[in-house]
Amino acid sequence: GRQYIDETRAFRSTNKPFFTDKLPNNFSHVGLVHLILPNAKIINARRHPFDSCLGGYKQLFGKGQDFTYDMMELAVYYRQYHETMRHWHRVLPGKVLDVHYEETVTDLQTQGRIT
């Protein structure tokens, strides 16, 4: 865990002890994050599948995100993401907080207090 925190320091613009790592494929690493950073807050920011896929399609990512340039691949990837998150909820109950984008933008006060 310490090595991850140290190595990601170069990508952060602040020295605060927390940050958000929001790459699209982080969901596959929930178990590892829980093991190496047991106090980490794991937030699953969800959005309507269409909006999520379209947002990924329009974003120019760095290496490793080639699936975002094809809508059919995005649809398959989204389904895999959804199934993987169901798995994490089963094996790590209460460790992942689902935050729904649509609810957050309509009621930020309530949603911001959930965590």
Q: Where are each of the predicted segments found?
A:
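Conserved nucleotide-cofactor-binding alpha/beta core module
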Residues: 1-2
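PAPS-dependent sulfotransferase catalytic domain
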Residues: 5, 10-114
